[in-house]
């Protein structure tokens, strides 16, 4: 029912230079771009850009806020369709504090040495050998635990990613080292299943941007908190094409980073399993207040019931009060006679 083609561009070196460009397998990032990052958002007070190579992994870092693929749509292709260009060997990494030195997401932060805090080889994490384009943002004091602080940090940091995206769009096909096809295949007659992914929606740094114009972008996206955390149905290919820009804090609670959705293992497994018919993915936010949690979980139950599925997977990320609605989603689906399995992605403490 659909195909996206990931067009891979190999990067082996990242340097600073007078302009953002790609020459051979070297990515150059424009010197002075830091000033534009700071100027873009009133709440951003300082910004520092580092290029972390594998021999520098044992470097101290403020809390890691996100790990993002660098990808862009080709031509007029929209998210979840057509061709997507992606850089291999390099990722964007956002870190940050407020002006008082308080980590963004202090109660669940991950400051420390990068090589000691990164869980290598996981879908949302950097892979060993990759170069990190690491931006450390300082936001206005005491906005680190409000929605506007983390949102400003992510929005400002995307200026750099977007400049790289624009360069990628202009490259000729000689830069493409591999074309990878991801297919969404429906299998009538097999067990029809849906994946329900509970994402954070309590506010502050527990939020997500849904369906940006560019993979893991900012422009055009809506925050699920602003949507009331109600279920949003997307295609499996939209998930794998970067339809979620994760704003969640990352620390002991192990929320899912933007890159996790780009390589979402459950979606990939279900697409490849010839015994199941994956009809779609439902994203549902986890509100702060219990009454709102049950409001939302009832919507989940009705949504899944309307799909006439043979079974459902419900996933949540990390741990905390999101397990209240996680349990309620499972209950609401199960009480309608639909077999349901719950999965939780939790950290090593």
Where are these regions (language model features)?
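Small-residue-enriched flexible segments
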Residues: 188-287
